[in-house]
Amino acid sequence: MTDAAIKDEVRRQLAVMREGAVDFYGENELAARLTVCLKEDRPLRVKLGMDPSSSDLHLGHSVVLMKLRRFLELGHTPIFLVGDFTARIGDPSGRNKTRPALDADQVKEHAKTYVDQVAKLLDVSAVEVRFNGEWMDQMTPGDFVRLCSQATVARMLERDDFSKRYASEVPIFIHEFLYPFVQGHDSVALAADVELGG
């Protein structure tokens, strides 16, 4: 592929990726990664993680699953991550109070249905399905402390959900601070180029 053809393809794919998006963070970085992938003739690795905090996905999940399907249609590698480890922590995102953590048995029961439900919108044979317990359950306490040493409390409080709760004097528990570290480590473990959320 010529440089001009690569530029055109990057523009085309970015337009497809932007369709229906409310927020599109890191577009310049994504364009650079996509350019490298096209030059190397390899797909982007696109991660979508969902915690099995209930037994069923809901209608809102279909929007981001359809976006994952668009990446597949563009020739990229979709990764559907079942957050079996993170569900045991409880996702604080967008919450004004602590989300209850689930025990391992509840998570296992809920996770059973997720892949079947995703298969209604995606060809799961073309999707890399993973569980973050694969690597997080193997991590030693020392490994986890080293991971957490990569950020400060001040930086964590910059997150909208935490800053609002802190300003309102709503408790933020330590395990909730750990959740974003696990999310970030998931992306590293999966060598994800793109992370979808919503």
Name each region found by the language model.
Residues M1-G198:
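NTP-dependent nucleotidyl-transfer catalytic core
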